[in-house]
């Protein structure tokens, strides 16, 4: 992107766009001050993942001594549809044995009720456990939490298959992916 002027976006290729809304979220820098020995820093100041929910987990760990798994911090892009992911990606698993299962959102009755059929639910599994999830869908951020609970608690695929998922819901897409 080269410039934004009068609601017209000019790309480096010279192409112009006239979007309704623009969200620019790049180039963030922490509002840093001098670090003090013996003081723990959280959030952007810690220089790690710049997500509010990550900063909250850091604060809870420091104040309540409740640990968390840094490899299970969810990421979400809020839009229509939402994009959410956690854990490993396929490229992280290259050279390893793993299984990929995918369910199209359009296969779910709830998506037709909501007129929101775009997207998919993708699960990556190893040794009967979910190691990664990627969701593009309405409510993707909420769906991801269900998967995070399973990952955090080492719940197996077979155990998840025992759960009754309500119909019609987006959640049943997770259930269907367990059988693929």
Predicted feature locations:
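Flexible, acidic loop-helix segments that line cofactor/substrate-binding pockets
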Residues: 68-82
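Short, small/polar residue-rich loop motifs at catalytic or cofactor-binding pockets
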Residues: 12, 48-49, 117-119
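Internal hydrophobic alpha-helix adjacent to the cofactor/substrate pocket in enzyme cavities
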Residues: 42, 52-72, 153
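Short FAD-binding loop at a beta-strand-to-alpha-helix junction that anchors the flavin cofactor
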Residues: 34-49, 129-130
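A Rossmann-like FAD-binding core segment of flavoenzymes
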Residues: 1-37
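Flexible, glycine-rich terminal cap/loop adjacent to redox cofactors
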Residues: 79-89, 94-180
């Amino acid at each position: 992107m080269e410039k934004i002027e009068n609601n017209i976006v000019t790309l480096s290729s010279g192409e112009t766009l006239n979007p309704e809304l623009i969200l620019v979220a790049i180039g963030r820098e922490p509002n840093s001050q001098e670090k003090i020995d013996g003081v723990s820093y959280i959030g952007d100041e810690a220089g790690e993942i710049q997500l509010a929910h990550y900063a909250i987990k850091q604060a809870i760990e420091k104040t309540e001594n409740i640990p968390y798994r840094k490899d299970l911090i969810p990421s979400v892009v809020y839009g229509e549809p939402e994009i959410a992911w956690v854990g490993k990606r396929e490229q992280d698993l290259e050279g390893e044995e793993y299984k990929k299962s995918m369910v199209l959102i359009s296969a779910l009755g709830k998506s037709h009720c909501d007129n929101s059929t775009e997207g998919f639910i993708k699960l990556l599994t190893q040794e009967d456990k979910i190691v990664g999830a990627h969701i593009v869908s309405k409510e993707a951020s909420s769906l991801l939490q269900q998967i995070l609970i399973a990952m955090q608690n080492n719940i197996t695929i077979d155990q998840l298959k025992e759960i009754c998922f309500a119909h019609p819901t987006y959640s049943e897409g997770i259930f269907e992916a367990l059988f693929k």
